[in-house]
Curated annotation (Swiss-Prot):
Record keywords: Amino-acid biosynthesis, Cobalt, Diaminopimelate biosynthesis, Hydrolase, Lysine biosynthesis, Metal-binding, Zinc
Function: Catalyzes the hydrolysis of N-succinyl-L,L-diaminopimelic acid (SDAP), forming succinate and LL-2,6-diaminopimelate (DAP), an intermediate involved in the bacterial biosynthesis of lysine and meso-diaminopimelic acid, an essential component of bacterial cell walls.
Cofactor note: Binds 2 Zn(2+) or Co(2+) ions per subunit.
Disulfide topology: none
Pathway recorded for this protein: Amino-acid biosynthesis; L-lysine biosynthesis via DAP pathway; LL-2,6-diaminopimelate from (S)-tetrahydrodipicolinate (succinylase route): step 3/3
Catalyzed chemical reaction(s): N-succinyl-(2S,6S)-2,6-diaminopimelate + H2O = (2S,6S)-2,6-diaminopimelate + succinate
Origin: domain of life: Bacteria
Active site annotation, chain numbering: D77, E142
E.C. code: 3.5.1.18
InterPro entries to which the protein is assigned, alphabetical: ArgE/DapE_CS, Bact_exopeptidase_dim_dom, DapE_proteobac, Peptidase_M20, Peptidase_M20_dimer, Peptidase_M20A
Protein name as annotated: Succinyl-diaminopimelate desuccinylase
Gene Ontology MF term list: acetylornithine deacetylase activity; cobalt ion binding; succinyl-diaminopimelate desuccinylase activity; zinc ion binding
Gene from which this protein is expressed: dapE
Required cofactor names: Zn(2+); Co(2+)
Length: 388
């Protein structure tokens, strides 16, 4: 194992031993900051607060004072492990067996943080900070509500005068094998609630009541009857998914007074949240007028807009580094859920590339040692090419 690979693997194992379940940091960022300071980075621990959520620790680190500026973004917080007894090893033990590292966050995304940290520290040790600037933008609030995390950290950095040319976000983008996918954008996400009012009554006397459920079903059918669009060159078609239908009625002999459905829409760059809301309101109003139903359609505030980073020389550079190390030409994709790239996009072009995501958030989350080693080599190649 090379020195670079050894450093990446040991950093990963140490990070995994810090049980940083959102909103706790458990020393993960302090450990990372100490390692980066030893390598010549200036570090800043920044805590953000909001009256409705717990305080969150964030980390910003930088080496270099000028030239091109490449920032790596990531998160040290992880989802809960669930029943630890279901795991092969302690989910916060950083254990290795059979060429695999086990632990909550191995894939999402302490492995990628460790790989980039190893590459960046080696690059700086070889005088790389004279060629440009490398920074880390690390939050502890990605798996949670994302209120005191990357969005605020970016604003904090910008107010300090930090300007980024490009960003790599270390999300586990690969589907089957390391090198098969780069995320160049993300779909937007919009949450909505449809409520239909009725008149409560006894089921034996339906003429004295008005059941809201059939009206709700008709309205939901109207919302989903026609596709929202056919997709674009870089995006799949937008999709509305009904996620719950509730009436709050535990009995068999009462017609409920109200029925409510919740839904989520993953939308492409054809739409803005306002345009999408207007389209769905028009569909609901048309169907509601025909059915004679009193309904209300409410949309939650949206901070996840659809976006795409147009392929360019930076995309080519990252793709070439991946293909050189893995022999795979990565697919450029906008699939999947939202990520903190939705915040970063407002400051600089952002690409997402990390480990294989097949075990993220699962029992026995694990990453192959060879993948972490290869990822560190890919990141090192990116740094060398970027600052050439």
């Amino acid at each position: 194992m090379s020195d670079l690979a050894h450093t990446a693997v040991e950093l990963c194992r140490e990070l995994l031993r810090r049980p940083s379940v959102t909103p706790l940091d458990a020393g993960a960022q302090d450990f990372l900051a100490a390692k980066l300071r030893e390598a010549g980075f200036a570090t800043h621990s920044v805590v953000f607060s909001d009256e409705s959520t717990p305080d969150i620790q964030n980390l910003y680190a930088r080496a270099g004072a000028g030239g091109r500026h490449l920032v790596f973004a990531g998160h040290t917080d992880v989802v809960p492990p669930g029943d630890s007894a279901s795991w092969r090893f302690d989910p916060f033990g950083g254990e290795m067996e059979g060429g695999l590292i086990f632990g909550r966050g191995a894939v999402d995304m302490k492995g990628a943080i460790a790989a980039f940290a190893a590459a960046a520290m080696a690059f700086v040790a070889e005088g790389g900070a004279q060629k440009g600037s490398i920074s880390f933008l690390i939050t502890g609030d990605e798996e949670g509500p994302a209120i005191n995390g990357t969005d605020k950290l970016l604003r904090w950095a910008h107010q300090r005068g930090e300007r980024f040319d490009h960003c790599i976000l270390g999300e586990p983008t690969n589907q089957q094998a390391l090198g098969d996918m780069i995320k160049i954008g993300r779909r937007g996400s919009l949450n909505g609630t449809l409520t239909v009012k009725g008149v409560q009554g006894h089921v034996a006397y339906p003429h004295r009541a008005k059941n809201p459920i059939p009206h709700l079903m008709r309205l939901l059918a109207a919302l989903t009857a026609e596709p929202l669009d056919q997709g674009t060159e870089l995006f799949d078609a937008s999709n509305l998914e009904i996620v719950s239908v509730d009436v709050g009625n535990p009995t068999f002999n009462v017609i409920p007074a109200e029925a409510r459905a919740r839904f989520n829409i993953r939308f492409n760059d054809i739409w803005t949240p306002d345009a999408l809301a207007a389209e769905l309101r028009a569909r609901a109003e048309k169907a509601g007028a025909a059915a004679g139903a009193a309904s209300a359609l409410h949309f939650e505030p949206c901070n996840a807009l659809a976006f795409v980073t147009q392929p360019d020389a930076f995309t080519d550079l990252v793709s070439a580094a991946i293909e050189q190390a893995t022999g795979r030409k990565p697919k450029l994709s906008t699939s999947g859920g939202t990520s903190d790239a939705r915040f970063i996009r407002a400051y600089c072009p952002v690409l997402e590339f990390g480990l294989v995501g097949s075990t993220m958030h699962a029992v026995d989350e694990r990453a192959p040692v060879e993948d972490i080693s290869a990822l560190a080599s890919i990141y090192a190649d990116i740094l060398n090419s970027y600052f050439k």
